[in-house]
Design a protein with these regions (language model features):
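Structural and coupling elements of P-loop NTPases
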Residues: 1-254
Length: 254
């Protein structure tokens, strides 16, 4: 629901467009249980920039999925329930993010709960960072208090509770885009391979350098640098909102 409202408030949808709730939970089990099982990408346009978002599972049963997602990220939002506080899955995901060198933004969420204890939860969160050997930069994490369902975020517990713009602004300020070279040969770290009934084999990932065009020959290599497959790109897509949109050229960072 947090991402749903981020998209709505950033103008990712037309005013008359009908939007389902829990956009990022597309599977039946995900919608039923309110959990994320498979990582899903989306994007938001904000103040002339594109923010790519990957909703990741939070449970250790999906460890490989979490690691693949974090390898594509420049930053992370760590959402923590203002009543339940730090959970086992919080520790698991945060440990992975810190190991990747990410500097998370902490969001104490669900502040509209009657039993919220935001200040205590923030202390618990700081203790968790310390226990996971976060460095000084990671320990100096920014904090927002929010209600994803109601669609607001503030720097203070008793803030005006108007919208999620403070969160979007903080992402722009705190998460620095990686310096990627568009002039080098094309390379992409693929995090998901699936079969599309119309397009055939499809890859989801982040272009780490160079550019990608249709009909461009490519090679797949393993972690040892050995070629394991080859072929050509037939179509290039980019996420706009939650929809895949065809583009002529994919560039480093897409």
């Amino acid at each position: 629901t947090m991402i749903d409202n981020l998209m709505k408030q950033s103008g990712s949808f037309r005013e008359n467009e009908v939007v389902d709730e829990r956009l990022m939970d597309s599977g039946e089990l995900e919608k039923e249980r309110g959990i994320t099982i498979l990582a899903k990408p989306a994007s938001i346009d904000w103040q002339g920039s594109r923010i790519n978002i990957i909703d990741t599972p939070g449970h250790r049963d999906f460890a490989a999925e979490v690691e693949r997602v974090l390898s594509m990220a420049d930053g992370a939002l760590l959402l923590i329930d203002s009543a339940e506080g730090v959970m086992p899955q919080t520790k698991f995901v945060l440990a992975k993010a810190l190991k990747q060198g990410l500097k998370p933004i902490v969001v104490i969420n669900k502040l509209d709960k009657a039993d919220q204890r935001a200040n205590e939860v923030l202390d618990e969160t700081f203790d968790l960072f310390v226990s996971l050997d976060a460095n000084e930069e990671q320990l100096d994490f920014p904090v927002l208090y929010a209600s994803g369902r109601s669609g607001w975020a503030d720097k203070e517990v008793d803030g005006p509770r108007e919208n999620l713009h403070p969160l979007l602004d903080l992402i722009m300020e705190h998460v620095k885009p990686a310096e990627l070279d568009k002039t080098k040969p094309f390379a992409m770290l693929s995090t998901l391979l699936y079969a599309d009934s119309f397009l055939g084999r499809s890859l989801v990932g982040r272009i780490s350098q160079g550019t990608a065009k249709a009909n461009q020959p490519i090679k797949a290599i393993n972690l040892k640098g050995e070629k394991v497959d080859e072929g050509k790109l037939t179509k290039i897509f980019r996420y706009e909102g939650t929809k895949k949109v065809p583009i002529e050229i994919g560039e480093a960072g897409d």
